[in-house]
UniProtKB/Swiss-Prot annotation:
EC annotation from Swiss-Prot or TrEMBL: 2.7.7.-, 2.7.7.108
Positions that bind Mg(2+): N272, D281
Keywords: ATP-binding, Magnesium, Manganese, Metal-binding, Nucleotide-binding, Nucleotidyltransferase, Transferase
The species this protein was found in: Burkholderia ambifaria (strain ATCC BAA-244 / DSM 16087 / CCUG 44356 / LMG 19182 / AMMD)
Protein family: Belongs to the SELO family.
Binding-site positions, ATP: G109, G111, R112, K132, D144, G145, R195, R202, D281
Protein name: Protein nucleotidyltransferase YdiU
Residues at the active site: D271
Entries under HAMAP family matching the protein: YdiU_SelO
Function: Nucleotidyltransferase involved in the post-translational modification of proteins. It can catalyze the addition of adenosine monophosphate (AMP) or uridine monophosphate (UMP) to a protein, resulting in modifications known as AMPylation and UMPylation.
């Protein structure tokens, strides 16, 4: 899996593909030095086969239309080299640390992920390719370094679904399966998912060098991130404080978008927080079905730390962890000779930045909810109206996605058209009371029902990756039928379109879906 254009380094069976993938090595992160990563080959995955491939991501990377049909494709993205790995092309696993479920976990790192190369995108950006499930690394701890088919399909589907919802995310290029057994809560089979992102740097990377008292390496990492992804920060009075602010604001925006579509991440540890404000590390995630503000999507989260309603608070807390890690760098430009005085000012400056999180998150979520309700004009009580709807949904366990989608059918003047959304509520009197408030608010709007409905349908998805939809695709894939993975991926590429031929994918979950559980055991 060399990404070199050299014929000597290319896989014999993949001359055209190797040339396409070609080139500039492993990217800028690997040049930071050995303190940041370990170079090693992937562990071969026996008899790999293609489960799914995103044509859109392939196009983003400039890969040909025939990319996924070339001989050796599965071998390449399973991490199986057909000859010895050239030293300059060895993949790498990066080291980081972090807080897990609010507790300092110490050194972590890419325990089953290997970055295999970097390619220029057709959008002018550069993208790292990382295989998840490529075998043990020095950071695997007690793990086997493998990913399972179940979690790999879920990550593949949700990465692309989130992108098409307009939510910042890592992307997914391929899923490669194998019949190799692995032990989790039960015996499962191995798989590798290829993730694509401008960067996989996490809050935990900064925490690692802070906790190891290596301000020199911390600064090297921060400079890398600033120069490559936040160049405007270099022009600020304090580039490292500006980096903290940029990451904090992006994180606030991201979580506001999560809340607006009912997405629960499930494992918001600091090592799962992207410095670029991307959704990263799709594990026991879930979209809320019957709305419960206390919804916990991760079976392993017994305390509810990462419940739906907690996500904004946890994201803010994680930004505090990032701020602590950056403190040794903040204020260096001020030339304060006294270390204690500089540290005190750094804390004050960081606190001021962190105070901007709620200032950013609140209005961002209000804008999103106003759009979901089809409100073009801004009114003081709009947040109260939205919150009252959520409270009513919570009390009736109304379906999150369908409630907002069907609200578009409600008329300003005719309550007889309320049935499609009203029927989602157990307490219909409570819904009627809210609907009366909503109509009063709509009377202040200038758009007619049709224009409002069209606007609402552009922001309220009809199709999201519900757990039971993923489960059906996974069960069929286990029988070597990958058609449902492809079909579901196609539906989720157009989440806001009606797609009448796929109406079943927008239905309420079946009764058996209530017994599904997802956990960290992927």
């Amino acid at each position: 899996m060399s990404f070199s254009r050299s014929a000597a380094d290319a896989a014999d069976t993949l001359p055209d593909l190797a040339a396409t993938l070609g080139a500039p090595a492993l990217g800028a992160f690997v040049t930071l030095g050995d303190a940041f990563h370990t170079r090693l080959p992937a562990a071969p995955l026996p008899a790999p086969y293609v489960v799914g491939c995103s044509d859109e991501v392939a196009q983003l990377l400039g890969l040909p239309a025939s990319f996924a049909t070339q001989p050796g494709f599965a071998e390449l993205f399973a991490g199986n080299p057909t000859r010895d790995w050239p030293a300059h092309a060895l993949p790498y696993a990066s080291v980081y640390s972090g807080h897990q479920f609010g507790v300092w976990a110490g050194q972590l790192g890419d325990g089953r992920a290997l970055t295999i190369g970097e390619l220029p995108g057709t959008d002018g950006r550069r993208y790292e390719l990382q295989i998840k499930g490529g075998g043990r690394t020095p950071y695997s701890r007690m793990g086997d370094g493998r990913a399972v088919l179940r979690s790999s399909i879920r990550e593949f589907l949700c990465s692309e679904a989130m992108h098409h919802l307009g939510i910042p995310t890592t992307r997914a290029l391929t899923v490669i399966g194998s019949d190799q057994p692995v032990v989790r809560e039960e015996i499962e089979t191995s798989a590798v998912v290829t993730r694509v992102s401008e960067s996989f740097v996490r809050f935990g990377h900064f925490e690692h060098f802070f906790s190891n008292d290596r301000p020199d390496l911390l600064r090297q990492l921060a400079d890398h991130v600033i120069d490559r992804f936040y160049p405007a920060c270099r022009e600020a009075d304090d580039p490292y404080l500006a980096l903290l602010e940029a990451a904090t604001l992006r994180t606030a925006d991201l979580v506001a978008q999560w809340q607006a579509v009912g997405f629960c991440h499930g494992v918001m540890n600091t090592d799962n927080m992207s410095i670029l404000g991307l959704t990263i590390d799709y594990g026991p995630f879930g979209f809320v079905d019957a709305f419960d503000a206390n919804h916990i999507c991760n079976h392993s989260d017994t305390s509810g730390r990462y419940a739906y309603r907690m996500q904004p608070r946890i994201a803010h807390w994680n930004c505090y962890c990032l701020a602590q890690a950056l403190l040794p760098l903040i204020g260096l430009q001020h030339g304060i000779a006294d270390d204690d005085a500089r540290a005190e000012r750094a804390v004050d400056d960081a606190q001021a930045v962190l105070a901007k999180f709620p200032e950013r998150f609140g209005p961002a979520l209000e804008r999103a909810m106003r759009a979901k309700l089809g409100l073009e004009l801004e009114r003081e009580n709009d947040a109260e109206l939205a919150n009252k709807l959520l409270e009513t949904m919570h009390a009736s366990h109304a379906d999150f996605t369908l409630t907002f989608r069907r609200l578009a059918q409600l008329s300003k003047h005719d309550a007889s058209r309320d049935a499609p959304v009203r029927d989602l509520f157990i307490d219909r009197d409570a819904f009627d009371a809210w609907a009366n408030l909503y109509r009063e608010r709509l009377s202040e709007e200038t758009r007619d029902d049709a224009a409002r409905a069209a606007a609402m349908n552009r922001v309220n998805p009809k199709y999201v990756l519900r757990n039971h939809l993923a489960e059906v695709a996974i069960r069929r894939a286990k029988e070597k039928d990958f058609s449902e993975v492809e079909r579901l991926a196609q539906v989720l590429r157009r989440p806001f379109d009606e797609q009448p031929e796929h109406e079943a994918y927008a239905a309420l979950p079946p009764d058996w879906a209530g017994s599904l559980e997802v956990s960290c055991s992927s």
